[in-house]
Design a protein with these regions (language model features):
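Conserved catalytic micro-motifs used in adenylation/nucleotidyl-transfer and phosphoryl/amide-
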Residues: 1-25
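Phosphate/diphosphate-binding loops
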Residues: 3-4, 23-69, 73, 78, ...
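Extended, highly charged accessory segments
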Residues: 5-7, 60-234, 239-247, 253, ...
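Glycine- and acidic
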Residues: 33-36, 135-143, 226-243, 262-274, ...
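Flexible, glycine/charged-enriched surface loops at secondary-structure junctions
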Residues: 167-174, 258-265, 366, 370-378
Length: 390
């Protein structure tokens, strides 16, 4: 056999000729090989997501529908999905989700590096305009590594963009091929077709509400259980950052050995006596550790953090291996803004809905800059450059 398949967006040209003397010619453009017009039996182009196969033994050309039909009928794949797939709505939770604690809000906002500008220029536009805030062309602020101000680790990373061989996508006009839906959790063996391979959790949006996060933290559904790892530390501890990251990684490996399907990294225990390890550092360290141990496909990584609040932050977390994020402190900051009449929403629930919509549009825009249309392809891709970090 020899064949070809075109990407689902149709961004790569592919044209073919079938001649009367039984030759098949395929190339990115017409005219690569000279063919007499009267010798052309059939010609066409490979369309988005379509396949093309030549069977040398039978001496025939197999079209896309025949290829897919032959494989689709081998197993009851739809039945497998209906029986095995898990959705967030399937997870019942008897534990009440964390609510709003206005008394400690200011202290926690300061601990996580929030500023008045963060709320005014980043969070409020996300919910009011339902999109990532847009500024004038150019960014003349100092690089994080050269700034006189204390900057969070996310500011040291710059997003890459598609160049030459990988064209960017218009995330608005090509919305039909863009998706933030993703399956997470233990993966089956790709070499074995069996129903258990479909036993995964489908998350439609990478930003989790507090209720969804609570359901995942206390998950006990059809064999799925969760291990929560605290990423805060005692400020009087003698352990250095490297030791604490190693401990998180070892706890992650042990969770897999104990049979857990999900790992939740949480910094909710922050207090005047407990500091925080950056959520980006902790999650990326665990992700890379599990890859090195060949264990990453056996578990999903969920992040419950007050650190992430901007679109860039969520893109970084996804790019370095996080499956979903619950930005609980961003929600609380916006709820307080609603109480202060800075935004006009009916209730806290509608604020969260608007925030998730704004973040979704922003993440799709960032993915589209790299020519990537699905979150599954963007996750763990590490398409960033670190400036000033060793």
């Amino acid at each position: 056999y020899i064949g070809a398949v075109l990407d689902r967006n149709g961004l790569r040209p592919s044209r073919y000729y079938l001649t009367h003397d039984d030759r098949v010619i395929m190339a990115s453009e017409v005219g690569v090989v000279d063919v007499a017009t009267d010798n052309v039996k059939e010609k066409g182009r490979l369309r988005p997501g379509k396949m093309f196969l030549v069977d040398f033994d039978k001496g025939e050309l197999i079209d896309d529908e025949a290829i897919k039909t032959s494989f689709a009928g081998k197993n009851p794949y739809q039945d497998w999905l209906n029986e095995q797939q898990i959705h967030l709505s399937d997870l019942g939770c008897d534990t009440e989700a964390h609510g709003f604690d206005p008394d400690s809000l200011v202290h926690r906002l300061k601990a996580f590096g929030y500023s008045a500008e963060t709320l005014q220029f980043m969070l409020l536009p996300l919910v009011n305009e339902l999109r990532d805030p847009v500024g004038s062309m150019g960014n003349d602020s100092a690089l994080a590594c050269l700034s006189d101000q204390s900057r969070i680790i996310y500011d040291y990373f710059k997003q890459l963009f598609a160049q030459v061989t990988n064209p960017a996508i218009d995330s608005i006009r090509e919305e039909v091929v863009m998706s933030l839906s993703c399956s997470i959790g233990p993966e089956g063996d790709l070499l074995q077709n069996k129903a258990e391979n479909a036993h995964r959790l489908v998350i439609e949006h990478p930003i989790l509400t507090n209720e969804e996060a609570a359901a995942l933290k206390h998950c006990n559904h059809r064999g799925w259980t969760t291990k929560t790892i605290d990423i805060t530390y005692d400020i009087d501890s003698n352990h250095n950052l490297s030791d604490m990251l190693d401990d998180i990684c070892q706890q992650g490996s042990q969770a897999i050995k104990d049979g857990h399907s999900l790992i939740v990294l949480s910094d909710r225990n922050i207090s005047e006596n407990r500091g925080i390890i950056s959520a980006l550092l902790a999650s990326s360290a665990l992700h890379r550790h599990l890859i090195a141990k060949f264990e990453r496909t056996q578990v999903g990584i969920i992040l419950e953090t007050g650190e992430a609040r901007e679109v860039h932050h969520f893109c970084l977390l996804a790019g370095y291996g996080v499956d979903a994020v619950n930005p609980y402190l961003a929600f609380e900051a916006l709820w307080q803004a609603r109480r202060d009449n800075l935004i006009d929403f009916e209730d806290n629930g509608t604020v969260v809905v608007a925030y998730r919509k704004g973040v979704a549009k922003g993440m799709l825009k960032v993915m589209a800059k790299m020519g990537i249309s699905t979150l599954a392809s963007y996750k763990g891709a590490q398409i960033f450059e670190a400036v000033g970090l060793a």
